[in-house]
Every structure is written in structure tokens, then in C-alpha cells.
Swiss-Prot record:
GO biological process: asparagine catabolic process
Active-site residues, record numbering mapped to chain: T49
Pfam families registered for this protein in UniProt: Asparaginase (PF00710), Asparaginase_C (PF17763)
GO MF annotation: an example: asparaginase activity
Cysteines joined through disulfide linkages: none
Organism per entry: Schizosaccharomyces pombe (strain 972 / ATCC 24843) (Fission yeast)
Residues that coordinate or bind substrate: S96, T129, D130
Domain Asparaginase/glutaminase per the UniProt entry, residue ranges: 39-359
Designated name of the protein: Probable L-asparaginase 3
Length: 360
């Protein structure tokens, strides 16, 4: 009896301890393990809190994001090897606030090459949560495949007690390896919930359950390493795919924030500095001031600058657009990438309007 109690106590204490990492090469060129009966999943690592490191196991704020390599992350979750063969690619290792469109374009082109391989079943991207939704929607609109792509992150660094990253990573691999995930577009997975990249957004800067999809709802959840989807495979209505396989640079698009007494000349300044399009994070359902609208109208009429009216609120529908383009359901950060891709494709303002209206 005592041996059972001691074993239970030891197991309970072990569950509370932070993961202890043994550093090794951050790149995994070959499959870490291979079982012919398991699907192949490639993990592209971008950094972020999921790869964060702190000197204390109780530190969840003052840590270094992007400090742990993909091989070490996979080593910390040995159960992954029960669900798939894993190959890891360290694309970069930084906090996601440091990522640029060039980084995301590079990631996209790497994934395009990977999903073209017939033996690859799915893709996982480990990523910082600050800009995770931006990368996710970019992939959703540029990687035209039925193979599962799952973007995953964490809200606690890898060294923290009860770090959420290991379970999130395991769940992401399980979803990417599942046939049930085929044909669902790019997905975001944290905290046992599976969301569409098109509609899922980060809502809280600190809490574990930060990623939400308020209006569209989640695609499903994962329980006991089994994905449970609420609906048959489908992608968002009106979603357009853009070909960036040969793109080397994306046009600059800036976001301007709406507030009382905003300076309308900031829009002119952004264009003068090279912006090819603007996204306005308007008040309420995308309201912009009258002086601001006059400046925007001039940019549209005189310089053919496409301007998208979005909202600074957490969620909602933006059909206020003056003479610009309504963002409808997209928030500013996602609207920015949609506009960048549309401009890059050479679409007219009417084409872009149709894309945002989900009627293209």
C-alpha cells in the first residue's frame, strides 16, 4: 500500500515540475523517428513563447521568447512519436512581434514545397501568439492544399510549471496527422480548441484561453488526443487563394488607428512613406472622422490608394466605408494581409471590395 501511495505522490509531483531541456541541434533534417504505419508531419518552428526560456520555473512574464530549438521542443513531448513521424525545420526563432511579411512569405514558400511531397500528411507551425493570427490567415489564403496546416503557440514559456506548450504541440501534431482534419484550411490550436485561421483571434494578452472565434465559432476541440470536429470539412465562404510561389516582396500596407481628434494627415504621411494601401482601425463599426474621410477620399480619387475600413473593436461587422472598402468581418491585422495579397495580385478596387465582402 505504501509503495502505491509513494508512487502516486511521485507522479503527482512530477506533473507539477517544469520540463527540463537538454539542448541539441535546433534543426532536424530527417524524421526523428520513423514508423511506416504512422503519417508524416513536418513542424516549422518560428519561435515565440512556446520556445521561451526563463531562469525560474515560476516566471511567466519576464522570459526570453524564441530560445529553445524545435528538436528540444519535440524531445520534451515523447508521446508525439506515437501519433506521427516528425521532421522539424527551424525557420527562425524570435518573438512573433519581430516577424515581418518577408518572414511569413518565406515560411509560406517552404510549406508550399513541403505539402507538394506526396508522403507528407500535414504541417504544424510553432509560433509566438502575439502575431500568430496574422501568419495563420496568410497561410490560409496562400497555401492551396487540402492537407492540414495547424498553427500552434503557448502562453507560458517552456520552462514554466504547467507550461501549456507541450500539450498544445502534441495536440497540434495529432490534428495535423488526422484524416478528419483534411480539407479544413489552416487551423489555430491552443487550449484544446481548434479554430479557423480566418476567424480566430487573440483576445487577451495573458490568459491561456486567449484565442477565440466569437461569431463564427470553433471548428472543434481535442479530447484525449482525438480531434472532435463539429462540422464536415469546409472553408470560409468566399475565401480567395493567392499564388505567392514566385513572389519575392509584398507591397507595404499600413494600419492607422481611429480615435477622437485623430490627425488626418497621418494617412498622407503613410502613403508618402511608401504605403500602397491603408487599413483603418476605425471606431465602433469602422467610423472615421469627417476630416479623416476627406483625406482618405483624396488618396482614393487622386492616387488610387485602396483603403479598407475595419474596426478597432474586438469583433463585429464593418460596412461603413465612405468611399473605401469595408472590411466586413475581418479585423485590421487580418485585413492588412488580405489587402497586401490583393494588391500584389493586381486586383482592382472593385475586385478587392468583392474579396472582403466574401462574394468573390
Amino acid at each position: 500500500m505504501w509503495s502505491s501511495i509513494i508512487s502516486f505522490l511521485f507522479f503527482s509531483v512530477a506533473l507539477c515540475q517544469p520540463l527540463l531541456f537538454q539542448k541539441r541541434s535546433s534543426n532536424v533534417s530527417d524524421f526523428i523517428s520513423f514508423n511506416a504505419s504512422l503519417p508524416n508531419v513536418t513542424i516549422f518552428a518560428m519561435g515565440g513563447t512556446i520556445a521561451g526560456y526563463a531562469s525560474s520555473s515560476t516566471e511567466t512574464v519576464d522570459y526570453a521568447a524564441g530560445s529553445v530549438g524545435i528538436a528540444t521542443l519535440v524531445d520534451a513531448v515523447p508521446a508525439i512519436k506515437n501519433f506521427s513521424n516528425i521532421r522539424g525545420v527551424q525557420v527562425t526563432n524570435v518573438g512573433s512581434e519581430e516577424l515581418t511579411p518577408a518572414n511569413v512569405l518565406n515560411l509560406t514558400q517552404l510549406i508550399l514545397a513541403e505539402v507538394a511531397k506526396p508522403d507528407v500528411h500535414g504541417i504544424v507551425v510553432t509560433h509566438g501568439t502575439d502575431s500568430l493570427e496574422e501568419t495563420a490567415i496568410f497561410l490560409d489564403m496562400t497555401v492551396n492544399t487540402t492537407k492540414p496546416i495547424v498553427v500552434v503557440g503557448a502562453m507560458r514559456p517552456s520552462t514554466a510549471i504547467s507550461a501549456d506548450g507541450p500539450m498544445n504541440l502534441l495536440n497540434a501534431v495529432v490534428v495535423a496527422a488526422s484524416n478528419r482534419s483534411i480539407g479544413r484550411g489552416t487551423m489555430i490550436l491552443l487550449n484544446d480548441r481548434i479554430g479557423s485561421a480566418f476567424y480566430t483571434t487573440k483576445t487577451n494578452g495573458n490568459m491561456l484561453d486567449t484565442f477565440k472565434s466569437y461569431e463564427a465559432g470553433f471548428l472543434g476541440m481535442i479530447l484525449d488526443q482525438r480531434p472532435h470536429f463539429f462540422y464536415s470539412p469546409a472553408t470560409p465562404t468566399g475565401k480567395v487563394h493567392f499564388d505567392v510561389s514566385n513572389t519575392t516582396e509584398l507591397p507595404a500596407v499600413e494600419i492607422l488607428y481611429g480615435y477622437q481628434g485623430l490627425n488626418p494627415n497621418l494617412a498622407k504621411a503613410a502613403v508618402d512613406l511608401g504605403a500602397k494601401g491603408l487599413v483603418l482601425a476605425g471606431m465602433g463599426a469602422a467610423s472615421w472622422t469627417d476630416p479623416g474621410n476627406e483625406v482618405i477620399d483624396g488618396l482614393i480619387s487622386n492616387q488610387s490608394i485602396p483603403v479598407v475600413y475595419s474596426h478597432r473593436t474586438m469583433d463585429g461587422f464593418s460596412d461603413y466605408y465612405y468611399n473605401g472598402i469595408p472590411a466586413y468581418f475581418q479585423n485590421p491585422q487580418k485585413a492588412r494581409y488580405m489587402l497586401m495579397l490583393s494588391i500584389n495580385a493586381g486586383y482592382s478596387i472593385q475586385n478587392i471590395t468583392d474579396i472582403f465582402s466574401l462574394e468573390y
